[in-house]
């Protein structure tokens, strides 16, 4: 390193330390990127910049990596720890020169040829200031926007104004030893490395800032000038007998209603504001598997985020997480109900585009919306939409609305230049601000329209909301999905877009189910959900602190022994710490006596806990059935358990969006039985599986596990009993009568869960019965009870509470519910 460079690093050290806040992406570089701190490291940056090097030094200090400003000694020779592709752009010249880095790499490869024990890691690092994507017509604000190789004067203003938005993005380490062994050590290999690095940095910039922003005129011309929209305008003019100009003006108004107006400045302001809010209301945000989206972006994929929808907070939380994981914030599909002043304008500038709840019958609106979405895909913008169509009121996933997925596939048919990947996202909370209004809606109250009053009321009520959880599920490569399900899908590219191919609906339905199962596969266990599940499974909804702590610990140990999936996450903390943090959320009554503390839901708030329990109920479906069988029969065999799972799993799979196939579910059950035995939640006598002894400390946990699926089984029993009573019944009548009986049982037995008699949940189960051929169909569409269905009813009735079983038997025999 020259004396001039050392002097500049010393001079700018304190100004940079004062002005710059370096954000490292990712934080866990060893695990995610394979960087070995014990081996020598050289950092490769795109531009020779003192401030970039100093901000990188701040980041490496935080990550305990070698300093980029120190000299690196290799085989007795000294090298700079930081290499650059290009020099800084001169003040009065339009382009930056290369640094002659090829010669340095050639020398390093020769060094590896001569020293077999040497293994240098080349770590590409992209340093960006701000995340401005650039515009077709630059304005004054673009003078301080970061660019590939700014002059020293421009860099001065960039650091002054964007120093707090500095991002250090590390890439996977490249082994110089591996390259030297595989490709040799001549100059052509160094040239190839430099060329690949240059392309890599371009993609990295694209993934962090996104493509150049569309100007409004360009947007209008692209949408209105498309063949589909022009045909729709002509059809609108002809069918409604209005002038062509009026129909075109209507299409223009739809664009204005729909389109986002992305402003990077608002994103930066929102980042600062949300950081303050999150620090106030959350104890932390846990993010899982973010490396997946970074890898997709690095490979040039168009990314479509499809998260579950728990709360209006989802819009902000997921965008915030994506931004802090080093990705460009997506354009977000939002319901038109959120387009009210001033929130609508803020959302629009944050990347939201608005859609109506239904497009039915409005061909012009449909054409404009489709063309706008296709334009986003083709220009390279990432997109986010909610497959459920609305927020879940019960805490469980809602059957998906397939409209947006269908439009996405139709866009593929018209030709999207890049590979498209759909990324399912699980979002979980320990406290949802809307949960009270959700339960009121389930009880029949009318949904309140979103308004400023609601926003201010929500802000006023901000408090300790515990942890937030965002897990990125396994991506679905849409091209590969279509190849496997519809091998000839490319033949439809030239077909008229208004005509749907016959394969579209079944393919979209399969894709939608795939999305939902991958969301649930990436579930996050948390303290609130586990505590809620335990208390609601107990007979009196009250437990001692010691019992609760033991049960939470036992359940966490069970999922560590037999994970629900590779994508599901378990808290790192102990059961004691998890319970302590959960009790601070203020959802529980805590009473203390001479024997310790008793914990129960706050008065009349047990129903709220069902929401959080339902977030993770699908994880407990199979272990819950296993233990329900063991306790109900006071002992059973593994073969009997496997037969029970084989019968019930297809129904649970449909309702709870479980990812395992039938064979995988049986293998999972087998592994669970072994883990339950090893963990003391089961005991074995000869071939018989029995509950733990009553004096065993795991007994209470096993008992709770046996009760956690009771409401689901009881709901099944209600539907099957009415089918048994009627023998032949229309689907509508079955849903109505099932709802009436379930409501009555809920009142009689004090069931806290509103979804016990929710029409949508009952309908989903009836649909699963039909799909799995438990029911026969009459010519008029009525459902006919079958012998197979009777066998299923007997299995289910044997698992529910005896008093509930007796009540339902009276219904079957006499048609009485009292």
From Swiss-Prot:
Q: Which family does it belong to?
A: Belongs to the GPAT/DAPAT family.
- Per its record, how is this protein called by name? Glycerol-3-phosphate acyltransferase
Q: What class of enzyme is it?
A: transferase
Taxonomic source organism: Alteromonas mediterranea (strain DSM 17117 / CIP 110805 / LMG 28347 / Deep ecotype)
Q: Which UniProt keywords apply?
A: Acyltransferase, Cell inner membrane, Cell membrane, Lipid biosynthesis, Lipid metabolism, Membrane, Phospholipid biosynthesis, Phospholipid metabolism, Transferase
Q: Which PANTHER family match?
A: DIHYDROXYACETONE PHOSPHATE ACYLTRANSFERASE (PTHR12563:SF17), GLYCEROL-3-PHOSPHATE ACYLTRANSFERASE (PTHR12563)
List, in alphabetical order, the Gene Ontology terms for molecular function in this entry: glycerol-3-phosphate O-acyltransferase activity
Pfam (any one): GPAT_C
Q: What is its main location?
A: membrane
GO biological process terms on file: CDP-diacylglycerol biosynthetic process; fatty acid metabolic process
Entry's Gene Ontology cellular component terms? plasma membrane
> What reaction does this enzyme carry out catalytically?
sn-glycerol 3-phosphate + an acyl-CoA = a 1-acyl-sn-glycero-3-phosphate + CoA
Q: In which pathway does it act?
A: Phospholipid metabolism; CDP-diacylglycerol biosynthesis; CDP-diacylglycerol from sn-glycerol 3-phosphate: step 1/3
What is the organism lineage in this UniProt record? Bacteria, Pseudomonadati, Pseudomonadota, Gammaproteobacteria, Alteromonadales
In short, the EC number is 2.3.1.15
- Renumbered to this chain, motif HXXXXD motif spans 308-313
Location(s) in or outside the cell: Cell inner membrane
Tell me which CDD domains the record gives: LPLAT_DHAPAT-like
Q: Which gene encodes it?
A: plsB
Topology in membrane: Peripheral membrane protein
How are the domains described in the entry? The HXXXXD motif is essential for acyltransferase activity and may constitute the binding site for the phosphate moiety of the glycerol-3-phosphate.
């Amino acid at each position: 390193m020259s004396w001039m460079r050392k002097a500049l690093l010393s001079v700018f050290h304190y100004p940079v330390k004062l002005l710059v806040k370096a954000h490292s992406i990712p934080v866990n570089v060893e695990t995610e990127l394979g960087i070995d701190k014990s081996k020598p490291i050289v950092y490769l940056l795109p531009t020779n910049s003192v401030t970039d090097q100093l901000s990188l030094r701040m980041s490496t200090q935080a990550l305990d990596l070698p300093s980029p400003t120190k000299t690196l000694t290799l085989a007795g020779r000294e090298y700079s720890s930081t290499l650059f592709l290009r020099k800084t752009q001169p003040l009065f010249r339009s382009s930056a020169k290369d640094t002659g880095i090829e010669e340095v790499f050639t020398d390093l490869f020769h060094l590896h040829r001569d020293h077999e024990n040497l293994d240098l890691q080349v770590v590409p690092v992209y340093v960006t200031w701000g995340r401005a994507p650039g515009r077709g017509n630059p304005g004054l604000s673009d003078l301080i926007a970061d660019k590939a190789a700014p002059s020293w004067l421009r860099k001065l203003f960039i650091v002054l104004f964007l120093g707090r938005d500095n991002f250090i993005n590390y890439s996977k380490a490249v082994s110089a030893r591996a390259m030297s062994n595989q490709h040799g050590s001549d100059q052509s290999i160094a040239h190839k490395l430099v060329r690949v690095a240059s392309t890599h940095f371009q993609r990295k910039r694209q993934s962090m800032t996104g493509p150049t922003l569309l100007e409004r005129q360009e947007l209008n011309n692209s949408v209105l000038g498309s063949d589909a929209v022009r045909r729709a305008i002509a059809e609108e003019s002809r069918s409604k007998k209005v002038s062509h100009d009026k129909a075109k003006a209507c299409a223009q108004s739809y664009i204005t209603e729909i389109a986002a107006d992305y402003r990077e400045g608002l994103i930066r302001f929102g980042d600062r504001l949300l950081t303050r809010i999150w620090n106030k209301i959350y104890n932390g945000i846990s993010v899982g598997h973010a490396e997946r989206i970074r890898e997709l972006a690095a490979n040039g994929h168009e990314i479509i985020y499809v998260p579950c929808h728990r709360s209006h907070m989802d819009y902000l939380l997921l965008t915030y997480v994506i931004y802090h994981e080093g990705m460009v914030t997506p354009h977000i599909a939002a319901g038109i109900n959120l387009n009210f002043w001033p929130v609508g304008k803020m959302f629009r500038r944050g990347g939201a585009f608005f859609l109506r709840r239904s497009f039915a019958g409005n061909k012009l609106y449909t054409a404009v919306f489709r063309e706008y979405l296709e334009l986003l895909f083709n220009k390279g913008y990432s997109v986010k939409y909610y497959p459920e169509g609305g927020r879940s009121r019960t805490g469980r996933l809602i059957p998906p609305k397939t409209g947006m997925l269908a439009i996405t596939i139709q866009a593929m048919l018209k030709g999207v230049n890049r590979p498209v990947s759909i990324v399912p996202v699980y979002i979980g909370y320990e406290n949802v601000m809307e949960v009270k209004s959700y339960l009121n809606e389930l009880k029949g109250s009318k949904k309140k329209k979103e308004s400023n009053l609601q926003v201010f009321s929500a802000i006023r009520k901000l408090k300790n909301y515990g942890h937030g959880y965002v897990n990125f599920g396994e991506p679905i490569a849409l091209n590969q999905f279509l190849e496997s399900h519809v091998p000839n899908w490319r033949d439809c590219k030239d077909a008229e877009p208004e005509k749907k191919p016959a394969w579209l609906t079944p393919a979209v339905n399969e894709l939608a189910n795939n999305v939902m199962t991958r969301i649930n596969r990436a579930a996050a266990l948390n303290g609130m959900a586990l505590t809620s599940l335990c208390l609601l499974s107990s007979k009196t909804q009250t437990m001692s602190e010691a019992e609760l702590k033991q049960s939470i610990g036992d359940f966490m140990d069970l999922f560590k022994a037999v994970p629900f999936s590779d994508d599901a996450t378990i808290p790192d903390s102990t059961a004691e710490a998890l319970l302590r943090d959960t009790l601070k959320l203020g959802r529980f009554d805590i009473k203390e006596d001479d024997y310790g503390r008793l914990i129960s839901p706050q008065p009349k708030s047990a129903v709220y806990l069902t929401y959080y329990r339902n977030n993770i109920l699908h994880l407990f479906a199979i272990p819950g059935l296993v233990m329900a069988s063991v306790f109900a029969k006071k002992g059973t065999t593994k073969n009997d358990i496997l037969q029970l799972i084989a019968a019930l799993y297809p129904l649970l799979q449909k309702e709870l969006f479980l990812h395992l196939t039938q064979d995988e579910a049986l293998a999972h059950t087998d592994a669970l039985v072994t883990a339950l035995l090893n963990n003391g939640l089961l005991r074995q006598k000869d071939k018989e599986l029995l509950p733990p002894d009553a004096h065993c400390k795991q007994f209470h946990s096993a008992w709770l596990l046996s009760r956690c699926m009771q409401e689901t089984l009881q709901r099944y029993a209600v539907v099957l009993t009415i089918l048994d009573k009627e023998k032949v019944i229309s689907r509508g009548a079955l849903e109505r009568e099932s709802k009436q009986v379930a409501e009555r049982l809920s009142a009689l037995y004090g069931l806290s869960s509103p979804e016990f008699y929710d029409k949508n949940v009952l309908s989903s189960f009836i649909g699963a019965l039909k799909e799995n051929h438990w029911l026969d169909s009459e010519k008029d569409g009525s459902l006919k009870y079958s012998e197979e269905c009777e066998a299923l009813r007997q299995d289910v009735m044997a698992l529910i509470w005896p008093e509930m079983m007796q009540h339902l038997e009276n219904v079957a025999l006499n048609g009485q519910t009292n």
